Amino acid sequence: MGYTVKTVAERTNLSPNTLRYYEKEGLLPSIKRTKSGIRHYSDEDLEWLGLICCLKNTGMSIKQIRDFVDLSLQGSATLKARCEMLVDHKRSVEKHIEQMNLHLEKVTHKIEFFTKQYEDFTS
């Protein structure tokens, strides 16, 4: 089944311009077009787009995602390299989560501090 840019944009909450940009950057290399040039996305393209969004939303750069896509296009010979790339990215995400948890603890502590200050002030 084929999906138009508009349909994919609605399903993914990405703008049509973002979808075109991802294609231009080589992140979606298998998008088919009609004879008149209209893009048609397949279910497999939507799966790829889901992975691309996941990687981007967790801090992977467009260049790194393109490198991952390029490796994927080379087939099974690059499975190990792709796995290593994702393991490295996972470590980076975990480190970021640790840092964010430290910030969250500090904010929580300040909320508790100011709540107590306010309660003492108003009683």
Whereabouts are the PLM-identified features?
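Flexible coil/turn residues that form the inter-helical turn or adjacent wing/linker of helix-turn-helix
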Residues: 1, 15, 58
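Arg/Lys-rich, alpha-helical DNA-contact motif
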Residues: 4-10, 29-32, 43-123
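Short glycine/proline-centered loop/turn elements that form peptide/ligand docking sites
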Residues: 8, 15-18, 35
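Conserved active-site tyrosine of GNAT-family acetyltransferases
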Residues: 22, 41
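Glycine-centered, phosphate/nucleic-acid-interacting loop/turn motifs that mediate DNA/RNA or nucleotide
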Residues: 26
